């Protein structure tokens, strides 16, 4: 037999991906690789709904708790680490199960995708340009060299990255976008959700996080440099509860804004994953969910 396909469990936040991944690992003798960028961070446990050791049920989980909150997550680094892990897991006769809602990270592990290099000095110059002239000026500059990216990108960091890539390579950033072509055989299982039910679940989950000590977790991480972390400080719940620590929001206000932001994030995740025709969708509340998913992964 050849190498088995990589399994990816995808879908919106709160849909039960982590639990399905564990059940598939138990069923298929697998190990789990985390593809949720915010779960890379040590100490970001409550707010990211990170799977606990007990919930892992003895299944090895990789790429959890690998970064300090001051470190920046890198899709390129993740691609290297995930592919090495996939090879190692397969070499031991086990199934590699990727799980997470960070769409680009999933694509980086599964698809043919190249990452242009970086230049810290160039990045700093572009950040200085942003501070001096504003987003509109940088977007206009990007429009001249890469109109596709200028139309698609709204986040300042990504606009800077697109300009950096163009200056480094002479190619538009959009030319590096991934093709829907697997790097090695893969099967993707998506959890299809009822949006109204998901919205209720996400609200309940945020309230449970608050009751479990999210504010204290954010306070502790703030002492470890959370605000200076370019990736970690943007995590859902953490940015909102930093405002509580600053006295600019109440706990109730931070919880409500976290619920709204989480629902918006779930919609963006669904839009991203629904665009991939290779994903097979199964209802998240299907009583035969594990058996159906295992069947797809065994074909």
From Swiss-Prot:
It comes from the Bacteria. The record marks 102, 123 as: Interaction with substrate tRNA. The keyword DNA repair does not apply. Belongs to the IPP transferase family. ATP binds at residues 11-18. Monomer. The lineage of its organism: Bacteria, Bacillati, Actinomycetota, Actinomycetes, Micrococcales. Its cofactor is Mg(2+). Its EC number is 2.5.1.75. One of its GO terms (biological process) is tRNA modification. Keywords: ATP-binding, Magnesium, Nucleotide-binding, Transferase, tRNA processing. This is tRNA dimethylallyltransferase. InterPro entries: Dimethylallyltransferase (IPR039657), IPT (IPR018022), P-loop_NTPase (IPR027417). Catalyzes the transfer of a dimethylallyl group onto the adenine at position 37 in tRNAs that read codons beginning with uridine, leading to the formation of N6-(dimethylallyl)adenosine (i(6)A). The keyword Transferase applies. One of its GO terms (molecular function) is ATP binding. PANTHER family: TRNA DIMETHYLALLYLTRANSFERASE (PTHR11088:SF60). Substrate binds at residues 13-18. It comes from Pseudarthrobacter chlorophenolicus (strain ATCC 700700 / DSM 12829 / CIP 107037 / JCM 12360 / KCTC 9906 / NCIMB 13794 / A6). It catalyses: adenosine(37) in tRNA + dimethylallyl diphosphate = N(6)-dimethylallyladenosine(37) in tRNA + diphosphate.
């Amino acid at each position: 037999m050849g190498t088995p396909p990589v399994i990816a469990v995808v879908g919106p936040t709160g849909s039960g991906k982590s639990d399905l991944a564990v059940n598939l690992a138990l069923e298929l003798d697998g190990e789990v690789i985390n593809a949720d960028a915010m779960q890379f961070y040590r100490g970001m446990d409550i707010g990211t709904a990170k799977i606990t050791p007990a919930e892992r049920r003895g299944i090895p989980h990789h790429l959890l708790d690998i970064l300090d909150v001051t470190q920046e997550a890198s899709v390129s680094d993740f691609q290297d680490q995930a592919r090495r892990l996939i090879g190692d897991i397969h070499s031991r006769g086990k199934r590699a199960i990727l799980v997470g809602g960070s769409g680009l990270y999933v694509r980086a592990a599964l698809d043919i995708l190249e990452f242009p290099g970086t230049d810290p000095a160039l990045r700093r110059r572009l950040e200085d340009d942003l501070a001096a002239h504003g987003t509109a000026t940088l977007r206009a500059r990007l429009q001249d060299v890469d109109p596709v990216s200028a139309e698609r990108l709204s986040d300042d960091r990504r606009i800077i990255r697109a300009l950096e890539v163009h200056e480094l390579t002479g190619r538009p950033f959009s030319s590096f976008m991934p093709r829907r072509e697997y790097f090695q055989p893969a099967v993707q299982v998506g959890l299809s959700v009822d949006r109204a039910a998901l919205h209720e679940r996400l609200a309940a989950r945020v309230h449970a996080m608050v009751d479990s000590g999210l504010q204290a977790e954010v306070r502790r991480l703030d002492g470890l440099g959370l605000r200076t972390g370019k990736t970690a400080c943007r995590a859902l719940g953490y940015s909102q509860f930093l405002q509580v620590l600053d006295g600019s929001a109440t706990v109730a206000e931070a919880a409500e804004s976290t619920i709204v932001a989480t629902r918006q994030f779930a919609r963006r995740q669904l839009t991203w994953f629904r665009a991939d025709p290779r994903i097979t969708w199964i209802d998240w509340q299907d009583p035969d969910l594990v058996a159906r998913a295992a069947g797809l992964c065994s074909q």
